[in-house]
């Protein structure tokens, strides 16, 4: 079996890379691909350990990056959702010749909440450790719980969960080692101090109702990164590209064309 990552490439135009989040796979982006492939050459990857790349594995962001570099286009617009936002941000910081613009979706430079040295909103560490424990026992149920958590608060929560579940089940299930490694990244990674080093234009997209990346994060980063752009989807929770698909795509297109 090949040890390279699975990529799906379609459309014509400037290169645009879509990176999914924890427990998911590239199929979550199908609506986005359908809308954008008339204007972009869209590259959708299954990250190591997920979907059609379930046979691969990576322990940290740089290991993921090294596997992405094998087939990633140069000078592309990178769009990363949730954990994928950490991956895309890491690419912009450490492999900047591959990234012309950076878009993070419902993502945070530090997913875990902290009280010290300053208050930082995010996922409570005990929630992340509970997911880790549950994952060892029953990873399918854990992923389903995470899907429900992602959609919670959105007016279309039931439809969002259904779409996420269909996407995950349409491809091979993720491997448990990669799921654990991903949770460790969500718990441990903190890119806040590195963000000002990003040299490419950056757009940060958020869902107003997101329970995993609280809207306060958008405000804090807006102050810390005044040169970046941000947009908040008022009806969305953690998956604005599904809940407000048309508005999401139009934000991407207008940022790409600037």
UniProtKB/Swiss-Prot annotation:
Give UniProt keywords alphabetically: Biotin biosynthesis, Cytoplasm, Hydrolase, Serine esterase
> Which terms under GO biological process does the entry name?
biotin biosynthetic process
User: What sequence ranges are listed for the domain AB hydrolase-1?
Assistant: 16-244
Instruction: Provide the reaction this enzyme catalyses.
Output: 6-carboxyhexanoyl-[ACP] methyl ester + H2O = 6-carboxyhexanoyl-[ACP] + methanol + H(+)
| Any one annotated GO CC term | cytoplasm
Subcellular location(s) of the protein: Cytoplasm
Q: In which pathway does it act?
A: Cofactor biosynthesis; biotin biosynthesis
MF annotations from Gene Ontology:
pimelyl-[acyl-carrier protein] methyl ester esterase activity
Q: What is this protein called?
A: Pimeloyl-[acyl-carrier protein] methyl ester esterase
């Amino acid at each position: 079996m090949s040890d390279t990552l699975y990529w799906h490439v379609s459309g014509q135009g400037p290169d645009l890379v879509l990176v999914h989040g924890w427990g998911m796979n590239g199929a979550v982006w199908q609506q986005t691909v359908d809308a954008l492939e008339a204007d972009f050459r869209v590259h959708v990857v299954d990250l190591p350990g997920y979907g059609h790349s379930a046979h691969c594995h990576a322990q940290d962001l740089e290991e993921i990056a090294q596997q992405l570099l094998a087939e990633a286009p140069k000078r592309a617009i990178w769009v990363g959702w949730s954990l994928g936002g950490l991956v895309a941000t890491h690419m912009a910081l450490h492999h900047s010749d591959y990234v012309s613009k950076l878009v993070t979706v419902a993502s945070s430079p530090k997913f875990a909440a902290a009280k010290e040295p300053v208050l930082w909103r995010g996922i409570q560490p005990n929630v992340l450790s509970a997911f880790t424990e549950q994952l060892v026992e029953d990873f399918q149920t854990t992923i389903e719980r995470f899907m429900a958590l992602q959609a919670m608060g959105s007016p279309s929560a039931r439809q969002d969960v259904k779409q996420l579940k269909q996407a995950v089940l349409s491809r091979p299930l993720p491997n448990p080692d990669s799921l654990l490694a991903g949770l460790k990244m969500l718990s441990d990674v903190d890119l806040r101090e590195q963000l000002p080093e990003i040299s490419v234009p950056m757009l940060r997209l958020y869902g107003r109702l997101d329970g995993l990346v609280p809207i306060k994060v958008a405000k804090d980063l807006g102050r810390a990164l005044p040169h970046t752009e941000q947009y908040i989807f008022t009806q969305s929770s953690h998956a604005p590209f599904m809940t407000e698909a048309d508005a999401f795509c139009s934000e991407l297109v207008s940022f790409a064309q600037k």
